[in-house]
Amino acid sequence: MNAAGVRMVVTRARSRGTGASLRRRGEKAAPLRSGEAAAEERKSYSPVKRRRKAQRLSVAYEASEGEGGEGAEHLQAPSWQPQDWRQQLDNIRTMRSGKDAPVDQLGAEHCFDPSASPKVRRYQVLLSLMLSSQTKDQVTAGAMQRLRARGLTVDSILQTDDSTLGALIYPVGFWRSKVKYIKQTSAILQQRYDGDIPASVAELVALPGVGPKMAHLAMAVAWGTVSGIAVDTHVHRIANRLRWTKKATKSPEETRRALEEWLPRELWSEINGLLVGFGQQTCLPIRPRCQACLNRALCPAARGL
């Protein structure tokens, strides 16, 4: 392009001002033209086409410097949220203010030996979560006490025969299967992680006997990282009763995905313990205590909706 052509493009671009560029912020850059198309454009050059192309390149640069980074989806307002959910959540917080449910005293945060090394504490957290599936907190806590009395480490578990391990964890739910899973997982941790537990959900759920709920809780309790919402049967049941999912869900994992679509991320770490205790004390699986619930006028299930 000669000097006169450059002056013409600059003059017309300035006459448009910066408003068009600001209004177009967030537009995607036009795909690069093929060599044949670019040659054709040079043959039929016009200042208007050149000006539009320059604007698109400018917008693409601005977008690359903007908010499109990792985690940006959590900054956007969700397209759907349940009706009255904030009031319902505040009411549950009020009902749970005493922190006197079984999960508050016997959950995974309370089952490890605080005097053990960080690596051993993380292992004990994972084992308590593996034992907790389909098991009341009181039973899980009792099994953990018996295991800890013998020195609960990866090595000690691998040196314990299956019958002895079964007697120590009985009567947790599916205790025979859990003996097998605990042994297999402990061997993997010894071989691949130097006796520690993985620090990612993907690696945790790859371990025998470890599901998504356990993995997210292990990340929170053992590693102090919020990786997702831990959904068990209590959270699954309450979320559906309150209509906290856009449509009815059939499994805890489906409920987790539905909740994470709209629940603000800063609430993810709180929601499990809050709803589990609420489910243990008030929103029971059978004959829920709706008359004692502050949400009875806001709960679709309580109103028969």
From Swiss-Prot:
Active site: 213
Transmembrane segments: none
Cofactors that this protein relies on: [4Fe-4S] cluster
Protein name listed in UniProt: Endonuclease III-like protein 1
Assigned protein family: Belongs to the Nth/MutY family.
Pfam families xref list: HHH, HhH-GPD
Subunit composition and interactions: Interacts with YBX1. Interacts with ERCC5/XPG; the interaction stimulates NTHL1 activity and NTHL1 binding to its DNA substrate.
Region (Disordered) residue spans: 1-83
Gene Ontology BP terms: base-excision repair, AP site formation; nucleotide-excision repair
Keyword Transport: no
A GO term, aspect molecular function: 4 iron, 4 sulfur cluster binding
Organism phylogeny: Eukaryota, Metazoa, Chordata, Craniata, Vertebrata
Reaction catalysis annotation: 2'-deoxyribonucleotide-(2'-deoxyribose 5'-phosphate)-2'-deoxyribonucleotide-DNA = a 3'-end 2'-deoxyribonucleotide-(2,3-dehydro-2,3-deoxyribose 5'-phosphate)-DNA + a 5'-end 5'-phospho-2'-deoxyribonucleoside-DNA + H(+)
Binding site for [4Fe-4S] cluster: 283, 290, 293, 299
Gene: NTHL1
Known role: Bifunctional DNA N-glycosylase with associated apurinic/apyrimidinic (AP) lyase function that catalyzes the first step in base excision repair (BER), the primary repair pathway for the repair of oxidative DNA damage. The DNA N-glycosylase activity releases the damaged DNA base from DNA by cleaving the N-glycosidic bond, leaving an AP site. The AP lyase activity cleaves the phosphodiester bond 3' to the AP site by a beta-elimination. Primarily recognizes and repairs oxidative base damage of pyrimidines.
